[in-house]
Amino acid sequence: MSRRLLAAACLMLSFSAAQAAERWETLPPTPTAVAGAKTGYAAVNGIKVYYTRTGHGSPVVLLHGGLSNSDYWGNQVKALAAKHTVISIDSRGHGRSSRDDKPYGYDLMADDVVAVLDHLKIPRADIVGWSDGAIIGIDLALRHPDRIGKVFAFAANTQTSGVKDAVEKNPTFAAFIERAGKEYAKLSPTPKEYDAFVEQISHMWASQPNWTDAQLQSIKTPILIADGDHDEAIKREHTEYMAATIPGAGLLILPNTSHFAFLQDPALFNAAVLGFLDSK
C-alpha cells in the first residue's frame, strides 16, 4: 500500500471513529408500530387515550416524552414483552389521543394513567418514563404510590430550573421538534392543531414541575434516575440532585447518549431498564 493510500485509509478510520463517538448527536428514526400488539382507546377524564398492549408477565407502562408518541418506544416494547405485559400510552393530546380545554398539568396526566390502568383492570404496574413521561412517573410516585411498583425515570426534571436554556436551538433537539410536528399531523385526531397543542402544553412547561425537596423526600417508591451523558435538555447537576434527594433512588448515566438514548443505543437502554425492573 502506498503512503498516500495508507494516509487516506487512516484518515477514513479516524473519521469513522469520530462519527461513532458522536452517536449522542444523532436522532435515529422513530420505530414503526409494534406488530401484533393489541390497540385500543380508553375514555378517561373527558378525553380518549390511545394505548397498546402486548406480552405476558408483570405489567409495565411506558410513558413517552412531550410532543412525541408511543411509537418511540418500539425498541423497548419488543425487549420488555418477553417478560412483561407492556402497555404503551399516547399521553393526552399526543399521538392518537385527544385533548380538551383543561389546562395541561402533570397531576392531570398522571391521573390519566391511573384511569387507563382502571380501564385495563390493572391494579399496579411499574413505570418506564422518558422526559415528560418520567415526570409523570414521579408524579405517580408522589400521588398514587399504591398503583405503581418501580419507576425508571429517564431524562426527567423536578423543577423548571433543571432544563437547559435554549434547548430548542440544539440541532438534535430541533430535528426532534420538527419530526414531532410531522408525526402529529399524521397521527392526531386534530391534525391541523399542532401549534395550538404546543401553546397549550407550553403553559405547563413554564411553571411545572416545581416540587420541593420535602415532596421528593416523601417518596417511598423505588426509583432509578437515569439520563444520557450528553442530554441536550436536562442539566447534569439537576439529575444528580434528584437522585440525591429522593430516598433510596439510584443514579445511572448512559454513555455516549443524549435525551434520546432509547433510540441511540436501545440495547444498552433496554438492559438498564430490565436490570432495574427485574432486580429484587
Please state what every model-predicted region is:
Residues 47-96:
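Conserved HGGG/HGGXW glycine-rich cap/lid loop of the alpha/beta-hydrolase fold
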Residues 54, 88-128:
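Active-site loop/oxyanion-hole signature of alpha/beta-hydrolase fold enzymes
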Residues 135-143, 149-182:
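Flexible "cap/lid" loop of the alpha/beta hydrolase fold
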Residues 199-215:
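Active-site nucleophile elbow and catalytic-triad environment of alpha/beta-hydrolase enzymes
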Residues 219, 225-227:
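Short beta-strand/loop motif that positions the catalytic acidic residue
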Residues 230-234:
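Acidic catalytic loop of the alpha/beta-hydrolase fold
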Residues 243-260:
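Catalytic histidine neighborhood in serine/cysteine hydrolases
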Residues 255-280:
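Catalytic active-site module of serine/aspartate enzymes centered on a nucleophile-bearing elbow/loop
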